[in-house]
Amino acid sequence: MIHELKILPEYFDAVCLREKTFELRKNDRGFKVGDYLYLKEWDGEKYTGREVTRYVNYILYDWTGGLQDGWCIMNLKTSHLKATLDQTRGEQDE
């Protein structure tokens, strides 16, 4: 499954630079290992046009040390899904 999510600029940059390889989110979408996060930079008022896709390869659903119920931490890996999606869209337009 592909989840389209907003992300603030300071976090977006860190994800793009591979400095931030995790995402803490309310698990209101039923995130699962094997999903993709389609992260779209949001400046608080509008989308900036920058976007990146990451693959979810591990999820921590509960942690007695402080993760609240209904939240999860996802480990992110680089993904080439967006390039594949763009290529597929281009082929459909022909």
Would you name each region that the model predicts?
Residues 1-87, 94:
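Catalytic phosphate/metal-binding cores of nucleic-acid and nucleotide-processing enzymes, i.e., regions
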